[in-house]
Amino acid sequence: MRKFTFRLWAVLMLMLVSLQTMATDTFTSNRTDFRDESIYFMMTTRFYDGDTGNNVLCWDNQSEQIKTKDPCWRGDFQGVIDKLDYIKALGFTAIWITPVVQNASGYDYHGYHAMDFQHVDCRYQSSDGSKDGDAMFQELIDKAHEKGIKIILDIVLNHTGNFGEQTLCKEFDRNTDLATQALINACMIPNEEKLGSDYLTSVPYEQYQRRLGLLKNVRGKNEDVHNYWHHFGDFNWDFPNRWWAQIAGDCVDLNTENDYVADYLVKCYGSFIKMGVDGFRIDTSGHISRLTFCKQFIPQFTALGKQYEDKRLNKAPFFMYGEVCARYSDVTYRGQDNLSCYYYTWQAPQELLDKWDGSQKYWDTQVLFDKANGGTGVDDHQMALCESDNAPTPTSDNTFMVNGKWHEPDYSQASGFHVIDFPLHYNFGNAAAAYGLAKSGDNRYNDATYNVVYVDSHDYGPQQTNDQFRFSGDDAQWAENLSLMFTFRGIPCLYYGSEVGFRRGAPIDRGPHGPLSETGRAYFGGYLTGDVEAKDFGDYTATGNVAATLNHDVAQHLIRLNKIRQAVPALRKGQWTDDGCTPADGGIAFKRAYKNDSYALVAINGGATFTDCPDGTYTDVVTGKTYTGSTITVDAPATQGQLRVLVKDWKGGQIGEDGPFIYNETPKS
């Protein structure tokens, strides 16, 4: 009898494992909706050094780089390739990498100071010279796809660096020999006809003024005769004139309202779509008007995505999301719709699009100077047209369940462009604040289930006491935020190292004023030495430091959350409501539904009571317990990050093992 009972138990366990394996296989092969993804965000040069021979010092702050043995250009594409299994072991299905195009500035390891949009930076080439940066990037895309991982490329449309741009205004020839890259005068050969024969002997300030003058008309004469750059001077971060202004010395504002400029950018970045990148994260989107996006970029990139869909993993639709920076605690940025994140998710009015005139013929009639040089920096038509795009947006129930059910969303007014959820990010000092903001503001987005959600990044942390620092919360606070991110609406995104609290509370960026090792952009490679092999998302074997990294409490929490999210379509793509949800102990509770196929009840930081639940059997994928009835009460310890996910008609049993934050009755480290 004992043998029979044991055999029956073994068969049942095998059936449960088989059902979960089938669900995983279905998820892996059917990821054609980007909401299926979870994103790991890295600064490529700071992640992992896979080719030590191509390390390069930035031009500025070289003494600190040498002293700390930490060249800014340290991580590389080979390093990402080598650690794809690490990212897969964590359960992440997509990688967002910082910009790859050729850069030029004193501190350009991050990639946001372009001098040539047509080529991958030469500092990404292999050290033996056999593969240039373009070839190495193609290899990364291909290797990632082989692992079932998508690549999101960070791109910049808003600006160049201040060393010109090789097509729009060529100021330098670039020597791409790797050995010359740490020496500015060895790798940057000035165009003396444009910059003067005494350029190299001039003081740095004079060199900068000469370079900038060719782009910005700041020397009292019209040097940018075709208006490839904007010429607006003083601006206010809180006014639409932020669309026309140079936001930093190394960020020279491109005239994206000029068709020639926009077409050139589309052509350059289109080559990466052709290579097979799966999506774009678009930098400084909030410094470009919505009208410009809807006219110049979104339709064009969407068409290119369709043209080259065979290059992408699973032929999924090309995905784009933008950084509409809104360092503000409310969903509407300082009372202004057209500067708010949600505004960009809606299509611009057709009557304004029809008035567009970005032709070179028009722009060649405009001679523009900023106020300091006797002008206004404002053209006769285009800028005013963009600023007239300021009508209040509609509201939408695309994010929400209606009458307790999923409903077909209405995308007839959608722009096709999605956003980083800056309001949630800014409120992620704790999960309750972020969730509360979503309750009041999700109707402003066309569909907030497409928002990319993170706690902190390479630019800002949440507004704790100062957003210039990486999130300073302890592991339990991380667990709480992550439990919400991976079960609530939106696409979860994690900044590299957060899985172990890396550089917790550190200043995010100090520029060339001190070593990178003391900032939130420190080198992470020491945590990744050793070997890791991922058989599937969240299923791995590892040795060395990388094994210890993966075994960190927060990393293990992430692995389980990724598994739960991947198993339940409602958590990835579902609409939500808190109707009929009463959390216990000050926690959070909501319902998620996707079509007629997936329905889940979620409780965070404790238990909850759910009413008006559809008939069926609900299985808590955290504990394996089952519930029935239209009113369901689930108990759970009232601890940070605690989670219950009751899935209707679920057949697979418990997902993952108890840990320090998610568990049945007793935490396990």
Region annotations inferred by a language model:
Residues 38-43, 93-99, 113-119, 150-154, ...:
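Structural recognition of the beta-strand scaffold that forms the well-ordered cores
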Residues 38, 629-668:
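C-terminal beta-strand-rich structural cap/linker in extracellular carbohydrate-active enzymes
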Residues 250, 448-471:
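Active-site clefts of carbohydrate-active enzymes
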Residues 141, 159, 191, 267-274, ...:
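Active-site-proximal helices and loops of the catalytic beta/alpha 8
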Residues 1-9:
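Bacterial N-terminal signal peptides that target proteins for export
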Residues 31-37, 45-275, 297-307, 318-333, ...:
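Substrate-binding/active-site clefts of carbohydrate-active enzymes
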Residues 21-23:
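Boundary at the C-terminal end of the N-terminal hydrophobic targeting segment
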